[in-house]
Amino acid sequence: MAAVELEWIPETLYNTAISAVVDNYIRSRRDIRSLPENIQFDVYYKLYQQGRLCQLGSEFCELEVFAKVLRALDKRHLLHHCFQALMDHGVKVASVLAYSFSRRCSYIAESDAAVKEKAIQVGFVLGGFLSDAGWYSDAEKVFLSCLQLCTLHDEMLHWFRAVECCVRLLHVRNGNCKYHLGEETFKLAQTYMDKLSKHGQQANKAALYGELCALLFAKSHYDEAYKWCIEAMKEITAGLPVKVVVDVLRQASKACVVKREFKKAEQLIKHAVYLARDHFGSKHPKYSDTLLDYGFYLLNVDNICQSVAIYQAALDIRQSVFGGKNIHVATAHEDLAYSSYVHQYSSGKFDNALFHAERAIGIITHILPEDHLLLASSKRVKALILEEIAIDCHNKETEQRLLQEAHDLHLSSLQLAKKAFGEFNVQTAKHYGNLGRLYQSMRKFKEAEEMHIKAIQIKEQLLGQEDYEVALSVGHLASLYNYDMNQYENAEKLYLRSIAIGKKLFGEGYSGLEYDYRGLIKLYNSIGNYEKVFEYHNVLSNWNRLRDRQYSVTDALEDVSTSPQSTEEVVQSFLISQNVEGPSC
């Protein structure tokens, strides 16, 4: 058989050819750039495998070269490996590319519309990659340059492009915690939407509304976030990119969780997980995004053990894709740290939780400014863990050192939250509550009481009298009154209120009830009401039996391996529950 008739190339022969090209890289550098994008990428990947990062960096820092490499779509997973290795090596390839693109856009400002359109398309792909890789500031620079090009032509095509650009810009600003700029971006997108509408044109609003929901959720404006999620769900139609559908389902699920509509949240997030795995595969970053939100749901419905497993799975994917000092890896470490802390709270074994909290902080401080808002939540988690370790410590000097470190972390988190959100915000209230618990551990009881009351007042005004967050703070204040201030009457009222909220939201087997029940047993012992002591010992025994039966078998990942409903059915089911009709998928 003649060689020309072969329908495939033996892998070893191909790899040998790639290696030969790489061995002669200096001489063949220019010729490499004329190769098809897939082969060109394979040459660059071989440079990466051989540790020749300086040469790889010099290639990737050229916009034309990198734009061509981005066209090798089936190599994206490997491209993330190379890119992250360069960033870890100190090659600022993300900022170099963003700067190069920005300069190119300024050069072509006077060129015709076709040249600008081509540049916008390159910008969307480049900015999309930088966004996916977590380099939000550089992605923002790229999208701002695209938006500038869009504004130079007041015609319909560029209005559509401007809307798309605003959606992408809003996403990276949300990711980078630039919430004040996010609001401006949404308003600008609406302006272009209105222009299109006046000319009888409609752009799909699902992605835009989904990003607005993410913005409002991050700012703890939960009622508004929920409202806009409904609007986003109405916009899900046939032909919409799967990525957009998955992201809208994720945001809607989170909004349902904080509204304590757990059945709706479960249906939405399970379908999002199924859809992401089915479409993107089980090693894709988008699948890990859905797992993090699935973990959030499980944690909030008190299925803590399974949430830890899901968060670990998400972290594993992100480490395999990005590795190194990457923001996506840091957020996965933080989520796993907090769920591990909650999971091991009663056992006191916090080594794993502390490891992940410190990894998150280490990565964030390496790649972001020291006053970045993302540090607030990571520092908060580490402070919670250190406080528990300190309480169990038998060495007084070590205990005081750990408590002081926790105090410094909590204060830093509080200042970052107040700067970003102001005083009257759920996130700020959480930090007050955490400080209240810490002051109790430090035996500063008046300061502790003040912090808890402040947290309760803010949460009640924002979330209502019967929210989970309110119950947490009420229970913490009850503990302070019971164990340290001998205010038993006040403590009893608060415990009973916390229990009532917990049972109403989560049922009789809710894990948080244990601490309230034990608190009441101690309280009734202190005042000599032994009938009540006996009663709550029985209640606690029944609670333990319920816990043993709860979540004993279910594998959360196995639970989402199939979907009993289509996307259209999931969307319609959600909208019908809101008494809203959506467009047909």
Swiss-Prot record:
Q: Which InterPro entries match?
A: APPBP2, TPR-like_helical_dom_sf, TPR_rpt
Entry's transmembrane regions:
none
The record's subcellular locations are: Nucleus; Cytoplasm, Cytoskeleton; Membrane
Q: Which GO terms describe its biological process?
A: intracellular protein transport; intracellular transport; proteasome-mediated ubiquitin-dependent protein catabolic process; protein ubiquitination
How is this protein positioned relative to the membrane?
Answer: Peripheral membrane protein
Offer a single GO CC term for the protein.
Cul2-RING ubiquitin ligase complex
Q: Which UniProt keywords apply?
A: Cytoplasm, Cytoskeleton, Membrane, Microtubule, Nucleus, Protein transport, Repeat, TPR repeat, Transport, Ubl conjugation pathway
Q: One short Pfam family name for this protein?
A: TPR_12
Pathway it belongs to?
Protein modification; protein ubiquitination
Query: Which residue intervals correspond to the TPR repeats?
Result: 50-83, 120-153, 206-239, 288-321, 333-367, 429-462, 471-505, 514-547
- Name the chain's protein: Amyloid protein-binding protein 2
Upper taxonomic classification of the species?
Eukaryota, Metazoa, Chordata, Craniata, Vertebrata
